[in-house]
Amino acid sequence: MTQDYKLQVEAIKCGTVIDHIPAQIGFKLLSLFKLTATDQRITIGLNLPSKRSGRKDLIKIENTFLTEQQANQLAMYAPDATVNRIDNYEVVKKLTLSLPEHIDGVLTCPNSNCISHNEPVDSSFKVKAKQGEIHLKCKYCEKEFDHQVVLQAD
């Protein structure tokens, strides 16, 4: 295969590529979704050129595959991202993300009085889309927050 361009982030033989992440969000996704909890090699591209959005972030995780549920949780902060499954340097499956109905054990409730801060329970939020905005409702305190507020709470 001849190419007239050079990859800015090295190709992987087998694993997951999360592409079209909004610029400045890649590191947050790595920590929020515990994508670094692996011994496998992770390659990160930040502020890469993008025809679609000007700039983007990119994450490649070797020998690791995200489930569709895990991938859809990324849609909260990277709604236009794609998750590609790579095998032998080829894309064998491409997931287009959609918002999940709920997200569990990932985010922290911004309400400091919520029991999820003091009790041994995993956080749990119902995902609601209202007039183009994403809101999260905590299962425990039942307060509703703009998803950006929850992102900043972590």
UniProtKB/Swiss-Prot annotation:
<feature type="binding site">
    <location>
        <position position="141"/>
    </location>
    <ligand>
        <name>Zn(2+)</name>
    </ligand>
</feature>
<dbReference type="InterPro" id="IPR020545">
    <property type="entry name" value="Asp_carbamoyltransf_reg_N"/>
</dbReference>
<dbReference type="Pfam" id="PF02748">
    <property type="entry name" value="PyrI_C"/>
</dbReference>
<feature type="binding site">
    <location>
        <position position="138"/>
    </location>
    <ligand>
        <name>Zn(2+)</name>
    </ligand>
</feature>
<dbReference type="GO" id="GO:0006207">
    <property type="term" value="P:'de novo' pyrimidine nucleobase biosynthetic process"/>
</dbReference>
<dbReference type="GO" id="GO:0009347">
    <property type="term" value="C:aspartate carbamoyltransferase complex"/>
</dbReference>
<protein>
    <recommendedName>
        <fullName>Aspartate carbamoyltransferase regulatory chain</fullName>
    </recommendedName>
</protein>
<feature type="binding site">
    <location>
        <position position="109"/>
    </location>
    <ligand>
        <name>Zn(2+)</name>
    </ligand>
</feature>
<dbReference type="GO" id="GO:0046872">
    <property type="term" value="F:metal ion binding"/>
</dbReference>
<dbReference type="InterPro" id="IPR036793">
    <property type="entry name" value="Asp_carbatrfase_reg_N_sf"/>
</dbReference>
<keyword id="KW-0479">Metal-binding</keyword>
<dbReference type="InterPro" id="IPR002801">
    <property type="entry name" value="Asp_carbamoylTrfase_reg"/>
</dbReference>
<comment type="subunit">
    <text>Contains catalytic and regulatory chains.</text>
</comment>
<dbReference type="Pfam" id="PF01948">
    <property type="entry name" value="PyrI"/>
</dbReference>
<comment type="function">
    <text>Involved in allosteric regulation of aspartate carbamoyltransferase.</text>
</comment>
<feature type="binding site">
    <location>
        <position position="114"/>
    </location>
    <ligand>
        <name>Zn(2+)</name>
    </ligand>
</feature>
<dbReference type="GO" id="GO:0006221">
    <property type="term" value="P:pyrimidine nucleotide biosynthetic process"/>
</dbReference>
<keyword id="KW-0862">Zinc</keyword>
<comment type="similarity">
    <text>Belongs to the PyrI family.</text>
</comment>
<dbReference type="InterPro" id="IPR036792">
    <property type="entry name" value="Asp_carbatrfase_reg_C_sf"/>
</dbReference>
<dbReference type="InterPro" id="IPR020542">
    <property type="entry name" value="Asp_carbamoyltrfase_reg_C"/>
</dbReference>
<keyword id="KW-0665">Pyrimidine biosynthesis</keyword>
